């Protein structure tokens, strides 16, 4: 007997709708960054900077709503949440950094490393969450490595930089030629954030 296909609309829960809000904010922020590069209108970038904290709010709320509605568990929830987080807290902050001047060869390496670490961290969590869960409550007691939404701190840092005019050729700490390419030291913040995400020894209690 053929298996019934999974109806996405019927499977969606209120928590899933909030997760889609998270992904939508991140996606629109990416497009706004691209439009800012073309048009140079600062309002576009301010809107992008606003949407990423809004994505974080959606991310927090979807978990809260899911816990309130335990009777209706989403079959899509965990994967949908991870994919949305990759967009809003991985790709979007990296695009934002590139938009504001991190365009040297080593900068791009750091931005790519950051995104790859975020993807890897979420994949590890999805695979190991059952093993890390408490036997009585079924809840994961701690995060291995920093959660990817902590990248919002980088977004806030870049918002301050944009506010005070320390972007593009005026980025803090300047730029240096390292071998075949240029590096802005600010890009190392992305590399550090990525490394913290994939750390196996850094354990953060889960609220």
Segment roles from a protein language model:
Residues 18, 48-55, 110-113, 117, ...:
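Hydrophobic alpha-helical transmembrane segments of polytopic
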Residues 1-60, 200-202:
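Topogenic membrane-insertion module of multi-pass membrane proteins
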Residues 1-3, 135, 139-207:
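C-terminal membrane-associated helical module and adjoining short loops/tails
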Residues 59, 115-128, 188-205:
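Transmembrane alpha-helical segments that form the membrane-embedded catalytic/substrate-channel core
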Residues 16-20, 24, 46, 67-125:
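Multi-pass membrane catalytic core of lipid/isoprenoid biosynthesis enzymes
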Residues 27-30, 54, 58, 63, ...:
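Alpha-helical transmembrane segments of polytopic integral membrane proteins
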Residues 28-50, 87, 93-112, 157-185:
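Helix-coil boundary and interhelical linker segments in multi-pass alpha-helical membrane proteins
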Residues 2-23, 64-83, 124-150, 202-207:
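Interhelical loop and helix-boundary elements at the membrane-water interface
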């Amino acid at each position: 007997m053929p298996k019934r296909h999974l109806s996405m609309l019927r499977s969606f829960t209120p928590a899933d709708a909030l997760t889609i809000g998270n992904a939508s904010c991140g996606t629109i922020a990416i497009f706004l960054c691209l439009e800012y590069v073309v048009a140079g209108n600062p309002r576009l970038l301010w809107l992008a900077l606003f949407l990423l904290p809004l994505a974080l709010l959606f991310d927090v709320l979807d978990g809260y709503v899911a816990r309130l509605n335990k009777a209706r568990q989403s079959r899509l929830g965990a994967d949908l949440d991870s994919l949305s987080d990759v967009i809003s807290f991985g790709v979007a902050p990296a695009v934002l950094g590139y938009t504001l001047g991190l365009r040297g060869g080593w900068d791009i390496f750091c931005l790519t490393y950051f995104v790859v670490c975020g993807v890897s961290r979420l994949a590890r969590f999805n695979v190991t969450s059952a093993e890390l869960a408490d036997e009585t409550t079924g809840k994961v007691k701690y995060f291995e490595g920093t959660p990817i939404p902590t990248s919002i701190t980088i977004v806030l840092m870049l918002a301050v930089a944009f506010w005070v005019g320390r972007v593009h050729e005026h980025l803090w700490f300047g730029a240096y030629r390292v071998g075949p390419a240029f590096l802005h030291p600010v890009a190392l913040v992305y590399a550090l954030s990525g490394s913290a995400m994939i750390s196996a020894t850094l354990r953060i209690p889960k609220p």
